[in-house]
Amino acid sequence: MVKEFAYRGIPKEELDNMSLEKLFQLFNARQRRSLTRGITDGKRKLIEEIKAAKAGKLKNPIKTHVRDLIILPYMVDVTVNVFSGKEFRPVTIRTEMIGHYLGEYVITNRKVSHGAPGVGASRSSLYVPLK
């Protein structure tokens, strides 16, 4: 048996039909505050592109630098390429992501693995014979 996703006890079908005001009441205070303060031009453009992609009107993949957009139910099943600071990483929005920020799913830093120090990196390495 497959477990159905429910956001705060409400199934996805009801979330799709719910008005934004009722949906905002389900979110945490941080998400509510972000959504009620208004939508910037960058977020508005991304929302329009997501709606066009859902309708099948968009040919190119969606690329964005907007990481602070809160995922809403109508954005589910869309792939968005989010900028990580170096490259665009694809994020396919799933139902479990509703209410989270888009940037939470693209890590901006990674573990650095340094190689061996080169010649002249320190005073003692000057006397190491070259290979």
UniProtKB/Swiss-Prot annotation:
List keywords of the entry alphabetically.
Answer: Ribonucleoprotein, Ribosomal protein, RNA-binding, rRNA-binding
Pfam families cross-referenced by the UniProt entry: Ribosomal_S19
The transmembrane residues are: none
Q: Molecular function (GO) terms listed?
A: rRNA binding; structural constituent of ribosome
Example GO BP: translation
Question: Listed GO cellular component terms?
Answer: cytosolic small ribosomal subunit
The record's listing under PANTHER family reads: RIBOSOMAL PROTEIN S19P FAMILY MEMBER, SMALL RIBOSOMAL SUBUNIT PROTEIN US19
Family classification: Belongs to the universal ribosomal protein uS19 family.
Q: What does this protein do?
A: Protein S19 forms a complex with S13 that binds strongly to the 16S ribosomal RNA.
What's this protein's name? Small ribosomal subunit protein uS19
Q: Write the gene name.
A: rps19
